[in-house]
Amino acid sequence: MAIETQLPCDGDGVCMRCQVNPPSEETLTCGTCVTPWHVPCLLPESLASSTGEWECPDCSGVVVPSAAPGTGNARPESSGSVLVAAIRAIQADETLTEAEKAKKRQKLMSGGGDDGVDEEEKKKLEIFCSICIQLPERPITTPCGHNFCLKCFEKWAVGQGKLTCMICRSKIPRHVAKNPRINLALVSAIRLANVTKCSVEATAAKVHHIIRNQDRPEKAFTTERAVKTGKANAASGKFFVTIPRDHFGPIPAENDVTRKQGVLVGESWEDRQECRQWGAHFPHIAGIAGQSAVGAQSVALSGGYDDDEDHGEWFLYTGSGGRDLSGNKRINKKQSSDQAFKNMNESLRLSCKMGYPVRVVRSWKEKRSAYAPAEGVRYDGVYRIEKCWSNVGVQGSFKVCRYLFVRCDNEPAPWTSDEHGDRPRPLPNVPELETAADLFVRKESPSWDFDEAEGRWKWMKSPPVSRMALDPEERKKNKRAKNTMKARLLKEFSCQICREVLSLPVTTPCAHNFCKACLEAKFAGITQLRERSNGGRKLRAKKNIMTCPCCTTDLSEFLQNPQVNREMMEIIENFKKSEEEADASISEEEEEESEPPTKKIKMDNNSVGGSGTSLSA
C-alpha cells in the first residue's frame, strides 16, 4: 500500500502514522533535528543517506514523488532549505549546551520566536550571566560593566586563559582575572529580585470585590454577581462588632461599637446571616468555625446529625465530614465514610486540649432538642470541650467524631431562672464512652477556667493571639513593613562617596560601586602621569596612584575609561519605580479613608436593639 504522508514519532514515542509505539531497534533518529522516525512507515527513498548521519525527510529537503500528491502539509523546498540551514547553524554553535540546542530547535520547528518572550522574562535576562545564561551565582563585574558568575568567569579567564570580555571583547586586566571580587550590590539585587518574584506569585492576578464595612447595609443583601436569589447567595451585611474571625470566648463590650454592651447570652437573630454580623458564629452554613492549627471558636447546633444529644448545660456534638457532597450538594443526611480528626474536627480537639471557650449558638432547626429556640438563631454562651473520641454513629456503619461540651459561662443560660452563671460541675456519665475509640481527655490545666477567688470564669492563661489583621491601620503597617524591606535593600545600591542611590553606577575592579560623576569628580584634575624634573633636568614621568575611596586598590587604569554598569542601572530604576507606585497606593488608601464614605447608612438604634432581643426562660 502506498504511503502518501511520512510522519515522525510524537513526544511519547508513538508513531504518528501507524499509532504504534515501536521498539528502539525499529526507529531512526535524525542527525539534524534529533526526531525519531518509525522505519517501516518510511519510504525506501527516505532511508538512503549520502552522508554518515541519516537525515529525516523534513531536514533532507528531498521531495519524494509518492508523498507529494494529496499532502497539503508538504513544506516548500525553499522554506525547508532555510529551516535545515538554521538547524545546522544551531548544531554547529559550540557555545550552546545540548539542552539549549534542543530548546532552540524546538522553538524553530514550532515557528516560535523571541517575540513570545514576555516583558518580565526580558527583565530577568538583563541580569543573567552571559556564559551560563542563569542568574549570576556569586556575581562579579568586569571593568567593562558586564556581569558573570564567579565560577563561569574563572573558567573563562583563568581556565581557558581568555583575557577579553566575551560580550564586548574589551581587555580584562590580569589582576582582575587573577583575583576577581564579588559584587555585593548585585547580590542584593538578585536577592530582591527573588523576593519580588515570590511576592508577585503569592499575589496572583485575582479580582477581589471588596466592600468596606461602613458601606454595607444592615442586613444581608444579594449582589448582581449572585447566581441565584435568596440568602444562600447573599453577601453579609454590616458587622456590628470589631472582633477578628479567630476571636475566642465571649464578645466583650469594648468590641460592641454601637451598643457598648457586647453580645449577651440569649440574644437571637432571624437567621445565620444576622448571627454572623454580630460575631457569635461567622460561618453561615458550616457548623464549626475554627482552624486546625489554632482551635475552634464557635459551633452551631442546627440538627445536622442525628447523633447529637442536647442536655442544655452539656451536650454531645458530632464532628463534620464523612458525607458525599459531590454534585454541588449542600447537605446529605447519609454517612458514606468514617470521620477523621482533621480540619474542623482537629480544631475542636485542639480546643479540648487547650481548654479554650467555644461559643455555642442553637438554631430552630434542631427539632429534637428541648433547649433550641422556637425560631431564629440564639446565642447560648460559651462551653468547654472536656472529652473527644470516635465511635460508630447511629447509622451503624461508619465512625464519627464525638465531643462532650460542658457550659462554663458567667451569664445564666436562657432556659434557667438563675441569677448567676455556671459553677464547676462534675462531668456527666456518657454510656457510649465504654465502646469509644481514640479517646482524648485533657490533662493540663485549661486556659479558660473558674477563679474561686473572684467567683467567675476567666482566662487563666493568655488567650490565643489573633492571626487575622482587622484594623486598617495594622494592614497599612504591614504593607509599609514590606516596603521598608525593599527600601533597606535599595540602600545596598548607594554610592560610597555621596551615600545616595547610585546614578550611572560604575563597578571598580575591587567590586565597589560609585556614581560615575562622583568617582570622576573625586579624581578630577589628577593626570595619569606626573612630570618630574631635577635642577632643570627632566626626569622620567611617574604614574599617579589613584586609590579607591574604599580600599587601597589602584584605579588609575580603570579611570581611563570607566564603563557604566547598565544592568545594575536598570535594576535600580525598576526598584525606584516600584517604590513610587507602592507609596502612591498607600497615600491613596489614606486619602480614601480620611474622606467620608460615599454611602453611609445610619443605624437605627431601635432596629439594632430589636435584632438582639433577650429571651427569658
From Swiss-Prot:
Residues 575-617 are annotated as: Disordered. Residues 563-593 form a coiled coil. Pfam families: SAD_SRA, zf-C3HC4_3, zf-RING_UBOX. Its main location: nucleus. A zinc finger (RING-type) spans 129-169, 495-552. Changing S292F: Loss of DNA binding activity. Residues 258-407 form the YDG domain. GO terms for molecular function: histone binding; methyl-CpG binding; methyl-CpNpG binding; methyl-CpNpN binding; ubiquitin-protein transferase activity; zinc ion binding. CDD domains: RING-HC_ORTHRUS_rpt1 (cd23138), RING-HC_ORTHRUS_rpt2 (cd23139). GO terms for cellular component: nucleus. Pathway: Protein modification; protein ubiquitination. It is found in: Nucleus. One of its GO terms (biological process) is protein ubiquitination. Keywords: Chromatin regulator, Coiled coil, DNA-binding, Metal-binding, Nucleus, Repeat, Transferase, Ubl conjugation pathway, Zinc, Zinc-finger. It comes from the Eukaryota. The RING fingers are required for ubiquitin ligase activity. PANTHER family: E3 UBIQUITIN-PROTEIN LIGASE ORTHRUS 1-RELATED (PTHR14140:SF46), E3 UBIQUITIN-PROTEIN LIGASE UHRF-RELATED (PTHR14140). E3 ubiquitin-protein ligase. Participates in CpG methylation-dependent transcriptional regulation and epigenetic transcriptional silencing. Mediates ubiquitination with the E2 ubiquitin-conjugating enzymes UBC11, UBC8 and UBC8 homologs (e.g. UBC10, UBC11, UBC28 and UBC29) but not with UBC27, UBC30, UBC32, UBC34 and UBC36. Promotes methylation-mediated gene silencing leading, for example, to early flowering. Can bind to CpG, CpNpG, and CpNpN DNA motifs, with a strong preference for methylated forms, and with highest affinity for CpG substrate. This is E3 ubiquitin-protein ligase ORTHRUS 1. It comes from Arabidopsis thaliana (Mouse-ear cress).
